[in-house]
From Swiss-Prot:
Stored InterPro entries: aa-tRNA-synth_I_CS, Leu-tRNA-ligase, Leu_tRNA-synth_edit, Methionyl/Leucyl_tRNA_Synth, Rossmann-like_a/b/a_fold, tRNAsynth_Ia_anticodon-bd, Val/Leu/Ile-tRNA-synth_edit
Keywords: Aminoacyl-tRNA synthetase, ATP-binding, Cytoplasm, Ligase, Nucleotide-binding, Protein biosynthesis
Matching CDD domains: LeuRS_core
Record-linked Pfam families: tRNA-synt_1_2, tRNA-synt_1g
Chain ranges for the short sequence motif 'KMSKS' region as given in the UniProt record: 596-600
Reactions this protein catalyses: tRNA(Leu) + L-leucine + ATP = L-leucyl-tRNA(Leu) + AMP + diphosphate
Keyword Transmembrane helix: no
Name of the molecule in the record: Leucine--tRNA ligase
Binding positions (ATP): K599
Length: 830
């Protein structure tokens, strides 16, 4: 008998080479799959940015997806499980400056490195469909989409105050500003007025919101809630305040009014002041008309240079503008303030302030000693609260509100909106928190925006036949501004419309555009990539993505944009689906010492070192066993060693297997008890595997599947029947192949010619129990365990229970006898 020494390095390199040479994981052509009536599964883990090295978060993400893909292949599905690279972005330019290299060179070198590192994990990717988003052919179709959206009116260009990163020298979307800092480099963000291109994601706000209902039960509720809140649909009243006569003189404009939007028209009688954003036009009018002190102007400019999120986090700051508006119902004069909590890009950039019933307004009014007025009570005919601020910011019943007093908030909202509409001084409208998506970036390493600036024609899209507009490679990247803006040879071009001299747009696209449609591109075979963005037949066959795996941090960035882009491409006629991802799994972070792994904390675990020391199967087993996929995973060196020991034992004990090409037939009733128990545990593990993969129990709780397999293996070790051993391995290698593929392929090849990597059914006879273990407790404390035959009467169960604990029943009175069928007997005594 050959020596059973487990050598993962040799086994894993052998099978990785085999899978590559035989293209083992390429999906079948759809005509073959369709003719064979094969069901499809599209399994996709979010693709990585090629930073240069994989980390444990990558390992966990891709092992989860790989386990799903391998299981579905075993069960006869045609599986698409692709991989690619989210390759554009600022880090490549930063590296170019630091290492004196070209961003393209740095990026593609990193891709080569990470591709090799991921290959050592034995991931079953479709290598034929791999691409990087920086590939020219990918950019070509992305630019085509941009042009089609421009022609459809879904893209426009305007000047606005934008989030500007002084270090990276680029615009950031609101979502890319984290606590007032750049999401990439952590530099404090300032506001800068610039032209940029916007995509009208707001045109799809209602559909994006409504379609979330279709995803209930298929996406995590937290992600759905985050997207609903980000879209932020609210209904309310839009109306205008007239300025007082003396204020109009200060403004230098006799016709200006102050437009506001409120979701709480029921509190309109509680307005004691109005607040405007520092960018509001009336502020500029007051400055131009020299109606503000220089010190106030400087303070307002300082607020302008603060990001929206930083304003929200900071203390409430404002300045009295010295002008007044007239309350449309009470005719009271109300002061107008500029305030840091009012944003120009939400609503009209002005708000009515009700300090008694709004926490933010209250804080501001308290700071600047502005008046309060209570117009709501909790109960009908309730007394006006004596405390400084009403306990309810919520709805209630109106007081001090003229003809609307006594009404509930909901009734008053409708009546007040109707009153304003009948008087033609306002109207009920729907508003959204969602803003149009600013997609211009002042950087080199991105997809060029395919627009041309012509003095005669204005802004003109490039001709489709001239695409792709590629990046020049002879650029100087020194960290100062946009290298494309300085490359005059590249910028100079002819106008696609009139043929005169013109200049290319030097801004590049936000990299979230690239990740908004990559999952659609995978559906098309490589041989068709040059001809079209998508092959419709292939796309119809593969989409939706059946399982999409990635971090919850992408909930309101990538996932919202991907849903939006899918709907746009549908409306442009490229695709026919409404939603891209049928199911979403958000995996938890990998922690060490209770914190997320990072270089700054010094708690990094290098996957390459882990694989070199223990093997890929050990790494895979650990990350899938240590915690359910959706939970955080705490690194544990001892657990890694334990995973390796299990695989070593699995390898060594294979000496008991007899070669065969089909599962042995065993008469369960003729076996000894320990043999029956081993078979029972083996088929319980198979049943658990089937349930986890088919019913997605607990978000694919692989840890319970692995635990059941280990329990079955231990039970096999307690018996010596070679047929039971052989059947046990036949089934266990089938169960574990998605988790630890290398060792399973090697053992299966040696003993079963890989015939066990096909659908297996549970032997119900093996699961039939003739007896059950009862825990016997006295006053809730476990005192014994008793094996009892199934089918006993309650009286018989109690008799056996009492016989098992005689010393605990001496000198006591039994007050109550409780039976939990097939589990427990509790005797309550005194």
């Amino acid at each position: 008998m050959q020596e059973r020494k487990y050598n993962p390095k040799d086994i894993e390199s052998k099978w990785q080479q085999f899978w590559t040479e035989h293209k083992s994981f390429e999906p079948f052509d759809i005509d073959i799959a369709t003719s064979d009536s094969m069901k499809k599964k599209y399994i996709l883990s979010m693709f990585p940015y090629p930073s240069g090295a994989i980390h444990m978060g990558h390992v966990r993400n891709y092992c989860i997806g790989d386990a799903l893909a391998r299981n579905y292949r075993q069960n006869g599905y045609n599986v698409l499980h692709p991989m690619g690279w989210d390759a554009f972005g600022m880090p490549a330019e930063n590296a170019a400056i630091k290492h004196k290299t070209h961003p393209k060179t740095w990026t593609y070198s990193n891709i080569d490195t990470m591709r090799k590192e991921l290959a050592t994990l034995g991931l079953s990717f479709s290598k034929e469909r791999e691409f990087a988003t920086s590939d020219a052919i990918y950019t070509r179709f992305e630019q085509e989409f941009f042009i089609k959206m421009w022609e459809r009116g879904l893209i426009y260009r305007k000047e606005a105050y934008l989030n500007w990163c002084p270090k990276d020298k680029t615009i950031l979307a609101n979502e890319q500003v984290i606590e007032g800092k750049c999401w990439r480099c952590d530099t404090p963000v300032v506001q800068k007025q610039m032209f940029q291109y916007y995509i009208k994601i707001t045109d799809y706000a209602d559909e994006l919101l409504e379609c979330l209902n279709k995803l209930e039960g298929h996406w995590p509720s937290q992600v759905l809630s985050m997207q609903r809140n980000w879209i932020g649909k609210s209904k309310g009243l839009s109306f205008t305040f007239d300025f007082s006569v003396d204020s109009l003189q200060k403004l230098g404009n006799g016709k200006v009014k102050l437009e506001v939007f409120t979701t709480r028209p029921d509190t309109i009688y509680g307005v004691t002041y109005c607040a405007v954003a520092p960018e509001h036009p009336i502020v500029q009018q007051l400055i131009e008309n020299k109606s503000l002190d220089e010190s106030v102007i400087k303070s307002i400019e300082a607020i302008k240079n603060t990001t929206a999120r930083a304003r929200a986090m900071s203390e409430k700051v404002g300045f009295d503008l010295g002008v007044y508006v007239i309350h449309p119902l009470t005719q009271e004069k109300l002061p107008v303030w500029v305030a840091n909590f009012v944003l120009m890009d939400y609503g009209s950039g002005a708000v009515m302030s009700v300090p008694m019933h709004d926490e933010r307004d209250f804080e501001f009014a308290k700071t600047y000693a502005l008046p309060f007025k209570c117009v709501l009570t909790k109960e009908i005919d309730g007394e006006e609260p004596t405390q400084e601020i009403c306990a309810a910011y919520e709805e209630g019943f109106l007081i001090n509100s003229g003809e609307f007093s006594g009404m509930s908030s909901s009734q008053a909202k409708e009546r007040i909106i109707a009153h304003f509409e009948n008087a033609s001084i306002g109207k009920g409208i729907t508003n959204y928190r969602l803003r149009d998506w600013g997609v211009s970036r002042q950087r080199y390493w991105g997809a060029p925006i395919p627009m041309v600036h012509c003095q005669s024609c204005g802004i003109v899209p490039e001709k489709i036949e001239n695409l792709p507009i590629t990046l020049p490679e002879d650029v100087v990247i020194d960290g100062e501004g946009n290298p494309l803006d300085k490359h005059l040879v590249w910028k100079d071009c002819l106008c696609p419309k009139c043929g005169k001299k013109a200049q290319r747009e030097s801004d590049t696209m936000d990299t979230f555009i690239q990740s908004s449609w990559y999952f659609l591109r995978y559906s098309t075979p490589r041989k068709l990539w040059e001809k079209q963005a998508f092959d419709k037949e292939s796309l119809t066959y593969w989409l939706n993505v059946d399982e999409y795996i990635g971090g919850i941090e992408h909930a309101i960035l990538h996932l919202l944009y991907a849903r939006f882009w899918t709907k746009v491409l549908r409306d442009l006629g490229y695709i026919e689906i409404d939603e891209p991802f049928a199911n979403l799994l958000t995996q938890g972070m990998v922690l060490k010492d209770g914190a997320k792994m990072s270089k700054s904390k010094g708690n990094i675990v290098n996957p390459n070192e882990l694989i070199a020391h223990y093997g890929a199967d050990t790494a895979r087993l650990f990350v899938l066993f240590a915690a359910p996929p959706t939970r955080e995973l705490e690194w544990n060196d001892k657990a890694v060693e334990g995973a390796h020991r299990f695989l070593k034992r699995l390898w060594e004990r294979a000496e008991h297997i007899e070669s065969c090409t089909q599962k042995p037939h065993i008469n369960h009733k003729t076996l000894q008890k320990n043999e029956q128990y081993a078979r029972q545990k083996v088929y319980e593990a198979l049943q658990k595997s089937n349930e986890i993969f088919s019913k997605k129990q607990s978000g694919y709780a692989f840890n319970t599947l692995i635990a059941a397999s280990m329990e079955a293996f231990n039970a096999l070790n307690e018996q010596e029947n070679p047929l039971v051993w052989t059947e046990g391995y036949f089934v266990l290698l089938h169960i574990l192949e998605p988790i630890v593929p290398h060792i399973c392929w090697e053992l299966s090849e040696q003993y079963f010619r890989r015939c066990n990597f096909a659908p297996l059914s549970v032997d119900k006879d093996a699961l039939t129990k003739e007896s059950v273990i009862y825990a016997i407790t006295i006053n809730g404390k476990k005192r014994a365990e008793v094996e009892m035959p199934l089918g006993l009467s309650k009286e018989e169960i109690i008799i056996q229970a009492k016989e098992s604990v005689p010393k605990w029943l001496e000198g006591v009175e039994i007050l109550k006898e409780i039976i939990v069928p097939n589990k427990l007997v509790n005797l309550v005594v005194k």
